[in-house]
Amino acid sequence: MRVAALLIGIIGGVIGWCEPAAAAEAPTAPAAPTDWHATVRDFAAKQFKHPAWGYSHSMRDYALARELAAADHVILDDDVLFAAAYLHDMAAFKPWENEKLDHSDVAAGIVDTVLKGTGFPMAKIDAVRGAIRTHMYYRDPVGPEALYLHDADALDWLGAIGVARVMALVDPNGGDPDGPKAVKMLEDNLKDVPARVLSPAGRGRVAPLKAELEGFLRDLRRESENLRTL
């Protein structure tokens, strides 16, 4: 028995020694727990750290999409919405980022690499891809999950949250963007985003959020000599 145990130990050591070292790879979702939602949520919280389009933005998009759909009495597939909301901006982060392509298209193409093995129902992956691909306000969503994610994401560019997100991008060392360029981004959002909110409930949210952003820009210009001292 001792000899057999010794041989097993030696063989195990040799096998372990012969295994090649794992190559450096992009971070992947952890092994599947009982609840795949927790896996995806934890993955997003760990990997997506950014003041404008990080984990907290994904949380807001998910919650607001559900609110808007409920207000419109529309039933959503929560599996599709949850996965799309928490992973829609993954290609804005390294190592998934591709500066030559729209981050929406890149994320839609690779989102399965995160969801596989988590317990997510992969038969729904195409719906997740579609919602991610059209989440930006300048794209046209198809299907309820895509529509309400699109509108939630658009509304997050307006109001006080929209201001906070854009101003968080300002380089504290005077790089790009500076304060005036951030203001230009806010003005562009004010001009372009409202008309692209498409759902009835979403459109109902536009006016007060637009007014908040307009008020901020008006006050900022007044208090900075029309941005000259910003």
Report residues per predicted region.
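Acidic/histidine metal-binding catalytic segments
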Residues: 74-83, 118-131, 145
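An active-site-proximal "capping" alpha-helix that borders the catalytic cofactor pocket
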Residues: 61, 102-117
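Boundary at the C-terminal end of the N-terminal hydrophobic targeting segment
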Residues: 18-24
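Divalent metal-dependent phosphate-bond-processing catalytic cores, especially two-metal-ion Mg2+/Mn2+ enzymes
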Residues: 30, 35, 46-59, 63-75, ...
